[in-house]
Amino acid sequence: MNKKVLLVLCDGMRPDALTNCQAAQKVLKNCVSTMNAQTVMPSVTLCCHMSLFYSMIPAHHGTKGNTYVPPSRQLLSLFDVLAIEKKKVAAFYSWGQLRDLCYPASLDYSLMIKGGNYGYEKANDRLTDAAIGYINQELPELAFLYLGYPDEAGHEHGWMSEEYMRSLENSWENIVRAMEAIPKDYAVIITADHGGHDHTHGTELPEDMTIPLIFAGAERDLVDNLENVNIIDIAPTIAALAGFAPNADWEGKSLLK
């Protein structure tokens, strides 16, 4: 198997909010998904991203908050594993702490637009533009697109607020735009790092811990049982799509048949 992958992560996206998101519903009509995947605890952004890309629980990668803690031994993330195999990988993001998701030399291309300066809505739009252009020109094996607007809206206005719902609509409009613009043989995986409640997250509440995992591209028919899915299962699944075995240290499982 040799599928190229676009991985989109909407920071703070609650699955129950997608019911009223028109752009999301367009995609969900023709996909394979679970709205009951689980993230890790503590349910905060950097910790959850580390668990996604390193496929292990926070106690094992060492970052248990939004401050990066170098692992006590050498670990390889999804980016690193693909880079070792000479595969082209790229990242587009608006939150600077995500720079620590791999060794610096593992990324062929990296674009960070500071959401706090430019605004997360504008950052969503510009990062999507950049990802579309790069994918169509370079055809990377993995492109990671981080859309940070929902988390920003949740903290400022409250999860499930009108502004939060608008941030989801913007994010999904960008997802639809990307899906329509890139080659149709790309796998497209859409997920979140955590949810949220009131103006915060980080607890064991279901609103914080439950995330969607959506397979919306060329990989739809390859996905197997989506029961008991955890965020640490995403990296092994992408590795399998790319044709590689998971790293020996990874703790998640592939979700492919």
State what each model feature region is.
Residues M1-K257:
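Feature captures the catalytic ectodomains and active-site-proximal regions of enzymes
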